[in-house]
Structures are given as C-alpha cells and as structure tokens.
C-alpha cells in the first residue's frame, strides 16, 4: 500500500506541477510505466464498468456527456456496426469543453471489419503510407497480400524479420497530409473510403455535428514500443469541426493537455473500440500517446475482439463480411499492435484551398518531429506520424 500511495502521489505531483516541462515529464513517466503496477493508478479508465474509474487528480474531472440520440437512426447505427446511440455511454472532462469519450459502442464482432479494412484495404494504393519513402509503388502496392501468410504462421521471436504490415506506421486517405509542408492540397487527394466516411458521420452527428464531412484520415499503426509525440492537429483549414479518433487492438495511454505545453495533461486509457472526439476548445489542445500496453487479460486479444462478425449482414450494411482466414491474419497482427483511425474535415462549406503554391520544406530530422520509437530490429527506425509536433 505504501508503494502504491507513493506512486499515485508522484503522478499527482507531476500532474499539478506547472512549468515548461510539465507535459513532457508526464509523457516520460508513462512511457516508462510498468503495466500491472501502481504506475497506472492515476490513469482514467472510462470503460471500467462505465464508472470512469481512476485514482489520480484527473478522475475528479470526469463528467457525463449528453449525446444527440435522435440524430442517428438505429438503422444507420447498425449499418455502421454500432449499437443504437441510446445505449452509448459518453463522458467529458471538466476544463476540457468539447472533449467527448465514448467507450466501445460497437456491436459484438463488428470491430473485425474496421481492423480488416485498416490492414487489408486502406493500406493499398493509391493511399499513401510511410513505406513509400523507402520502397517503390510496386513493392507497396498490396501490403496485405505480401504479409498475410507470414502473419498467419509467424513465430513469436524477436529475431525474425518483420512483414511489411508490421513495418507500416501510417497511412493517409482522402486529402493526403503532406508531412514536409504540414499542409493539405487539392491536387493530393484520393476518394475517401465510403464506409469510414459513413461511420465517422454517424458518430459526429451523435455528438452534435450533423453537417460533418469526412475528408481526410490518418491511420496510425502502433507496435508495443511505439509512441506518438506531443502535438496539435491544426493543419485543417476548418477547426470548427471535430477530430474523431477510433482505437482497435491493444490499449494505449492517451494524454490530453492544454493550449500550451507547460500545462500538465490528463491521462486516460484508450481500449479497443473506444471513440474519442476533440471539438470546440479541445480541438486544438496538445495531446500524445506515450505508451501502448499489452493486453491486461493475458497474452492475446481483448475480450471485445473474441466474438466473430456475423456471417450474414443486412443488404444495406456498410460493413462487409470478414472470413476466418482474414481474421486469423488480423488477430496475429493485433496481438502486439494497436491501430488508430483519426478522421477530420479539412475545408469549411464552400471553402477552397489557397491558390498560392505549396512549397516543399526541408524535413526536420530532430527527435522532436518523430513519434514512433521502434525497436532495434526494425528496418524503418522511426516514422513521423503526427501532423503538427
């Protein structure tokens, strides 16, 4: 009990300590945290029997959030693989207006579709990924096809070479984010996935944004040793629309800070199926992911991923069947990984991109700009996945 109290106390001290390094101190603390110890006692767990359990100073900030139940029909929710909005739980945080956290609202089995899409479909060309800078378009044309047999029969050993899917760190869809100029442009665009657009628009409508348009997405692929650096998503031209985040696979610690980095962040878990919305005041807050955590239920996948996707789906469903062969590949991947989809609207209604040419800027190769810290066996040592660090 003494060690636990001391650990919680140290987190509380860091969380309330102002100063230039307030965010970074907590980032380092949680990056080095040990699962199953008192290190994580101060992390808010919104999914803990829907009780928003936590013992740190952040737990006192948790409040219930109201959703717009009538804005999404049960039929449309079902088409996206979601429970009726009336059955969702939603939380906010005092001091963070516009922040909404929805613990796993997906129907049993329906997460399978979104995981498969991230690994099998969205990773294909013409979408853009981090491997494009190191390989030809032909080599990255179909990462799934090149990796599926390897993942299906892979052996758990640190010395084996990784498949291309395991080297994947980010994919962009819709308006493709330019990591060098930190801008979007009209001429760097491919059609946004219709199923992901539909899912995003239902969630946005339930949160009060019925006119939200899904125009750009950044998919992040985390290994257990990956991190996402402190940053703000500010490159979109319309900040009045929310940023949506969908998590699948292993859990992660998410840090939500303030407008400046000298404000200490609030720590929370993001589990498989959880959805997070940053809007209004919270749309431009600093945030980061310092730690991906192995499944606390033991080796393998979270329980919410055990139920299979129904073999027969409604004719108008945006969700497609997932074969057991495909899921075997997905499950093998997720045992040591997390996938996150972030969706945003880039332009306001009737808004166009600026006419001035977008100049390419030299890439900043400092550690600050790189977010994923991979292990020593990776051929792609570090991959930048956050827009505005």
UniProtKB/Swiss-Prot annotation:
Subcellular location: Nucleus; Mitochondrion
Catalytic activity: 2'-deoxyribonucleotide-(2'-deoxyribose 5'-phosphate)-2'-deoxyribonucleotide-DNA = a 3'-end 2'-deoxyribonucleotide-(2,3-dehydro-2,3-deoxyribose 5'-phosphate)-DNA + a 5'-end 5'-phospho-2'-deoxyribonucleoside-DNA + H(+); a methylated nucleobase within DNA + 2-oxoglutarate + O2 = a nucleobase within DNA + formaldehyde + succinate + CO2; an N(6)-methyl-2'-deoxyadenosine in DNA + 2-oxoglutarate + O2 = a 2'-deoxyadenosine in DNA + formaldehyde + succinate + CO2; an N(1)-methyladenosine in tRNA + 2-oxoglutarate + O2 = an adenosine in tRNA + formaldehyde + succinate + CO2
Outcome (variant: residue 133 to A): Reduced DNA lyase activity. Slightly more reduced DNA lyase activity. Strongly reduced activity
Impact when changing residue 154 to A: Does not affect DNA lyase activity. Strongly reduced activity
Region (tRNA-binding): 86-389
Variant or mutagenesis effect after changing residue 231 to A: Near loss of Fe2OG dioxygenase activity. No effect on DNA lyase activity
Result, substituting residue 94 to A: Does not affect DNA lyase activity
A family per Pfam: 2OG-FeII_Oxy_2
Residues under site feature: Secondary catalytic residue forming the imine linkage with DNA: 133
UniProt remark on cofactor binding: Binds 1 Fe(2+) ion per subunit.
Tissues and organs where the protein is expressed, per its UniProt entry: Ubiquitous.
Consequence of substituting residue 371 to A: Does not affect DNA lyase activity
Effect of residue 344 to A: Reduced Fe2OG dioxygenase activity
Documented effect of changing residue 61 to A: Does not affect DNA lyase activity
Assembly, per entry: Monomer. Interacts with DNAJB6.
Family membership: Belongs to the alkB family.
Name of this chain's protein: Nucleic acid dioxygenase ALKBH1
Organism: Homo sapiens
Lineage of the species this protein comes from: Eukaryota, Metazoa, Chordata, Craniata, Vertebrata
Gene that this sequence comes from: ALKBH1
């Amino acid at each position: 009990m003494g060690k636990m109290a001391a650990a919680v106390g140290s987190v509380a001290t860091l969380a309330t300590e102002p100063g230039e390094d307030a965010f970074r101190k907590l980032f380092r603390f949680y990056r080095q945290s040990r699962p199953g110890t008192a290190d994580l006692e101060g992390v808010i767990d919104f999914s803990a029997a829907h009780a928003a359990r936590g013992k740190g100073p952040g737990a006192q900030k948790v409040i219930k959030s109201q959703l717009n139940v009538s804005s999404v029909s049960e039929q449309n929710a079902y088409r996206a693989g979601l429970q009726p909005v009336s059955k969702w739980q939603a939380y906010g945080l005092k001091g963070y207006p516009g922040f909404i956290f929805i613990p796993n609202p997906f129907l049993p089995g329906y997460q399978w579709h979104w995981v498969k899409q991230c690994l099998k479909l969205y990773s294909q060309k013409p979408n853009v990924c981090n491997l494009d800078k190191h390989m030809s378009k032909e080599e990255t044309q179909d990462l799934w096809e090149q990796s599926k047999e390897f993942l299906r029969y892979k052996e758990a050993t640190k010395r084996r070479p990784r498949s291309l899917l395991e080297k994947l760190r980010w994919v962009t869809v819709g308006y493709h984010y330019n990591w060098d100029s930190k801008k979007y442009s009209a001429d760097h665009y491919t059609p946004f996935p219709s199923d992901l657009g539909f899912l995003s628009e239902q969630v946005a409508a339930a949160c009060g944004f019925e006119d939200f348009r899904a125009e750009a997405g950044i998919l992040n692929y985390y290994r257990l040793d990956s991190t996402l650096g402190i940053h703000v998503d500010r490159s979109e031209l319309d900040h009045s629309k929310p940023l949506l985040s969908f998590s699948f696979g292993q859990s992660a610690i998410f840090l939500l800070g303030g407008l400046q980095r000298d404000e200490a962040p609030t720590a929370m878990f993001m589990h498989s199926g959880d959805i997070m919305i940053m809007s209004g005041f919270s749309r431009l807050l600093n945030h980061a992911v310092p730690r991906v955590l192995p499944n606390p239920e033991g080796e393998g996948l979270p329980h919410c991923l055990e139920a299979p996707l129904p073999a027969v789906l409604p004719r108008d469903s945006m969700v497609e069947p997932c074969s057991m062969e495909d899921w075997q590949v997905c499950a093998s991947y997720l045992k040591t990984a997390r996938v996150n989809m972030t969706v945003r609207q880039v332009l306001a209604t009737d808004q166009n991109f600026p006419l001035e040419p977008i100049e390419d800027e030299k890439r900043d190769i400092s550690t600050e700009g790189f977010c994923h810290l991979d292990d020593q066996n990776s051929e792609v040592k570090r991959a930048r996945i956050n827009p505005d660090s």
